[in-house]
Amino acid sequence: YDPYIADAYKVPDSHKAICEKTLAWYAANEKSLVDADCYVLYGAASLWGVALEGALKIMEMAKRIAIGYELEDGLHGPTMAFNEKTCVIALDGGDYGSEKALGCGEMAKSESGKGFVIGGKGFDSTDLAFDVVSNDFRALEFAPAVQILAYKLSQSVGVDLTAPLTPPKKEYFALHDEPAMTSIYSGDKK
């Protein structure tokens, strides 16, 4: 386990630099990022989970539509829906999928002007390039970047994250309660 532990210890040291770079990247690209109405995040291998987490955080915090795809799967049908309001973010871990992540970012840049690569060397100056230092814990290195993106986006679009949220109170959300299930399927309105 020693090699894994040594690899894991690299991650916290990289977080400060990644966070600082993410804040600067967001400031430089804020207009383009805010102008999007849909965010599509791509990641290969362990970065697929980061793409999913990033999409979830954008929806939770910034109240914008977002979806995360596995890099290979997302390069087919979903690209047919891209338009000038679609922001595409490809996560590049510098390993498996790196070439496709760069290609995805490049394609989105030329199609909508809202394509970005996070991690690795990037494609151009609008990308968030950083050194990926871990082999087996890359996802932990990328997590702060997508979390900061969601947070900064929420600030830019005016979402008050300190305001309490009340989840919808509808019968649908009580589906695990047997009486609610009975009333829904029987047509009874309680």
Residue ranges of each PLM-predicted region?
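A SIS-like phosphosugar-recognition module
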Residues: 1-190
